[in-house]
């Protein structure tokens, strides 16, 4: 099982993840991505889904038109792990390629 990050490690990781913050009221990190339109938002989700499936680590997310709200946590560990940080980095890289606002 993957080990949950300490508070200090989680805060340090968040400093290196633009747009991400601690999720309110739970042991998780969150970010809202805003894209040009629905097609771009859905394209982002499709690309992330491929990575998530490959690593067997799936986000909690919600899509409304051009907005994708994401929450990452590792349920088995009861909080944020390196797997969440890695997926957040991948999401930021994909979003940067698609030029979100």
Swiss-Prot record:
Keywords: Lyase
SUPFAM superfamilies membership: PCD-like (SSF55248)
GO MF annotations, alphabetized: 4-alpha-hydroxytetrahydrobiopterin dehydratase activity
Its EC number(s): 4.2.1.96
InterPro entries in the record: PCD_sf (IPR036428), Pterin_deHydtase (IPR001533)
GO process terms (BP): tetrahydrobiopterin biosynthetic process
Catalytic activity entry: (4aS,6R)-4a-hydroxy-L-erythro-5,6,7,8-tetrahydrobiopterin = (6R)-L-erythro-6,7-dihydrobiopterin + H2O
Protein name, as recorded: Putative pterin-4-alpha-carbinolamine dehydratase
Species for this entry: Rhodopseudomonas palustris (strain BisB18)
